[in-house]
């Protein structure tokens, strides 16, 4: 199996922070936490920042990943939320 650069840099288990940017709608945070809870149950405390005009929210949430596949899987699931514009 060929590893990409990010996968080579990480040693598992590790803490990994996602930054999700989406439309400023009340359900955004709940949708993000629900997806993460389904894959990795735990207590998550997302940090939320609003854009200057209030149109977007930036949500940072840290997980404890056991494999690179968990990181990738969550990235794609978070990206598929209809009100999400970007996942970093």
Curated annotation (Swiss-Prot):
Gene3D superfamilies in alphabetical order? 3.30.70.260
Q: Which SUPFAM superfamilies match?
A: YbeD/HP0495-like (SSF117991)
Transmembrane residue ranges: none
Give the source's domain of life in one word: Bacteria
**Disulfide bonds, which pairs?**
none
One GO cellular component this record assigns the protein to is: cytosol
The record's Pfam families line, in alphabetical order, gives:
DUF493 (PF04359)
Q: Where is the signal peptide?
A: none
Q: Which family does it belong to?
A: Belongs to the UPF0250 family.
* HAMAP family for the chain: UPF0250
Q: Any idea what this protein is called?
A: UPF0250 protein bbp_432
Originating organism: Buchnera aphidicola subsp. Baizongia pistaciae (strain Bp)
